[in-house]
């Protein structure tokens, strides 16, 4: 069966693994998921990610990040734009997550960017997710 929303599946796996204090989580690989993982790593929400060969296709493994006393680095994740209801933001009206403490991940003509990067470049796009 095909997956209708691979990004939502990725975020759900990440949320569930984070809640269960797992050290890593695996999922089917795609370029879009790898770019989302790049943003999460650059913003300090995950420790790293790697692409691995599986029996069928490839898989993406995210290494979760925790504080010294096993505090979660990700407090929450929310999918915003869904296949049934796309959500777009203009460059003049970009979302701010928790007053700037979290990030919004946008799909723009310049690739995947955070809300801060999109604001600096002056581009808008589809709001994929909020992470805080």
UniProtKB/Swiss-Prot annotation:
Provide the GO MF annotations for this entry.
Answer: rRNA binding; structural constituent of ribosome
Pfam families named among the record's database cross-references: Ribosomal_S8
In the record, which residues are listed under signal peptide?
none
Record keywords = Ribonucleoprotein, Ribosomal protein, RNA-binding, rRNA-binding
| GO BP annotation list | translation
Q: Which GO terms describe its cellular component?
A: ribonucleoprotein complex; ribosome
- Respond yes or no to whether keyword rRNA-binding is given for this record: yes
Family, per entry: Belongs to the universal ribosomal protein uS8 family.
Q: Which HAMAP family match?
A: Ribosomal_uS8_B
Describe, as the record does, how this protein assembles with itself and its partners.
Part of the 30S ribosomal subunit. Contacts proteins S5 and S12.
- What function does this protein fulfil? One of the primary rRNA binding proteins, it binds directly to 16S rRNA central domain where it helps coordinate assembly of the platform of the 30S subunit.
Q: What is this protein called?
A: Small ribosomal subunit protein uS8
This chain is encoded by the gene named rpsH
């Amino acid at each position: 069966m095909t997956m209708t929303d691979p990004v939502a599946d990725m975020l759900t796996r990440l949320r569930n693994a984070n809640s269960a204090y797992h050290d890593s989580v695996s999922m089917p690989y795609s370029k879009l998921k790898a770019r989302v993982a790049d943003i999460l790593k650059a913003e300090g929400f995950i420790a790293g990610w790697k692409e691995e060969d599986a029996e069928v296709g490839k898989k993406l493994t995210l290494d979760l990040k925790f504080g010294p006393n096993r505090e979660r680095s990700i407090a929450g994740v929310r999918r915003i734009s869904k296949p049934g209801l796309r959500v777009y933001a203009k460059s003049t009206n970009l979302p701010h997550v928790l007053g700037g403490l979290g990030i919004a991940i946008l799909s723009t003509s310049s690739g995947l960017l955070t809300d801060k990067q999109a604001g600096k470049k002056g581009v808008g796009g589809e709001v994929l997710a909020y992470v805080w």
